Amino acid sequence: MSEIVIETKQLTKQYGTQKSVAKLNIHVRRGRIYGLLGRNGAGKTTTMKMLLGLTPPTSGEVAIWGKPLPGNEKKLLPRIGSLIESPGFYPNLTGTENLRIFAALRGLKNQNAIQSALELVGLPYRDKKLFSQYSLGMKQRLAIALAVMHDPELLILDEPINGLDPIGIAEVRSFIRALCDERGKTILISSHILSEVALLADDIGIIDHGVLLEEESLVDLEAKSERYVRFTVSDTERAAEVLNGLLHENQFAVQDGHHLRLDSAKVPVAKIVSAFVQRGLEVSEAATVEESLEDYFKRVTGGEGIA
């Protein structure tokens, strides 16, 4: 088991009577990408702010590299790079000039750090374009460059692909993956885009209304997705009688009045279809259905799902 880099215990943030985050227990392991997945307003940004000491928790604990965050900020935070909402860049300066100011404030003396960070996110080092002239995607790239400029061990990135076009999303996904695989970085990202989290993360935490519903590796989460056989027949009532005779136990359900769902078949599907036909039933479909991550997300949140 990998070392735990971030651990929270019963982490809670309450505004008045409203709990933005409730008793959150997350575990981010060294050298892996953890995707915190949830709809807008689910509590992702608030969680990340508490992990960085930007907002105090109402209750609960945050530990980073095994050390409690309160009282150890000066030791821990320099080892972390973050993107939370939009950094305060100067509109009348270029991207490079903005990074130079932040580098000076941090006491960063590596002369190549700025150029390397810009190259990593696909922005030119000698570009004369002012920040005010940047597109939303370019602004997001510059924010990520700021997060990685000091070569941190841990990255905490809130919605890092926000504002990017499909090509930009693929590029950001690629260099985030490379930061983990090639440079050994530990990375926590948040997103409301399930498909992107599934392509990028090793481990996933599903958060909804401030509550962590699931925390699993991507492999284990995919294994939890349901798999069943769906039959479409001319008469579901008669088909149910056939299944009762074959299975001798309640392993199926009628869906929408037109379909039968069989969760586990001890009898071969071909034999079931044959039995239907022998009883004079028309079988227009006998298909194995595998639940997608989107379907799983809908099921565990009881909601409409996300992108």
Regions found by a protein language model. Give the residues of each.
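Short, Lys/Arg-enriched, disordered terminal segments
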Residues: 1-3, 306-307
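Generic structural signal for individual residues within well-ordered alpha-helical segments
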Residues: 77, 99-100, 115-118, 170, ...
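Short, charged/small-residue-rich alpha-helical element at the C-terminal edge
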Residues: 227-300, 307
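Alpha-helix N-cap/helix-start and coil->helix boundary motif
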Residues: 12, 96, 120, 194, ...
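ABC transporter nucleotide-binding domain
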Residues: 174-263
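ABC transporter nucleotide-binding domains
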Residues: 3-8, 13-189, 194-208, 212-214
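Non-catalytic alpha-helical coupling and interface elements of nucleotide-dependent molecular machines
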Residues: 104-107, 302-306
